[in-house]
């Protein structure tokens, strides 16, 4: 069964057959010299379906949205960064079963400078897994940019994440 969402006080409430869960946007505060850049998920839309999954899993959350990022390469430069953000409803470790995700570049700016002029933008990897500190699914997206005679800035990605859970 699919659900509808309604906004109440900055939160989105999912109405389904037998539960109400608040879903809100949040970011991860990673600290230290090797911290990955973090961002907030924006425009998140969630569909919850009742399923008969493995090992008692009975819910499938499908989440789509965008995340603003800023990764840039100039002239003869290569840059790779891994961005992280949280998606979906709060879940305990016992409720969470598995998550998968995909991502694509949604917005980029290219400024042509000198010959030869070429650039490459890639999504190298997408990982989605439960984060025990935040009790939500953390998505990690590795983005690569190569510039040759251009300045390339990636400013937004779109994502889709599926979460299998037991409610």
Model-assigned labels for residue ranges:
Residues 2-167:
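Extracellular attachment/recognition segments
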